[in-house]
Amino acid sequence: MSKMENNTVNKAGSTGVELNLNDGTQRYQVTKKDLKKTADRYNFMACNIFNYESQMGPAVAWAMAPVLRKIYKKDEEYKEALNNHFNYFNSTTVMSSMILGATLAIEEKDGIEAKETVQSLKTSLMGPFAGVGDTLVWVLWPTIMGSISGY
């Protein structure tokens, strides 16, 4: 299957890549700049829009909204994808950007049909990533810094 690339300029003014598929449809290809922007938005807001019902879910939706808009051109699909990311999410902030990148890859490849897969992936990864992230950020780092400062 051959794919042709067209450089396009979206509403925000940044250059993205549209893939022309053999069936005549176009699909947005997520760039490294999109992933970095999503991670930065999430890291900035993860604890600011925290609530006890969905924990960090609103931060996930807010961080992914610009890229989801590029992936989903139709308003109905965009709203459905965005609502899917408002569900419960709780993991260490530093590690969560990897989970968001993986979910964006699935959204990009499979579209709205994979919304249950996206939610399952987030649910299955947030626990292990929280365990590793909490150990690194809240146990290992303070122990090393305390040892150095006490020396």
Feature locations, PLM:
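Soluble N-terminal domains of membrane-associated systems
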Residues: 1-114
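Transmembrane alpha-helical segments and their cytosolic interface motifs
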Residues: 118-151
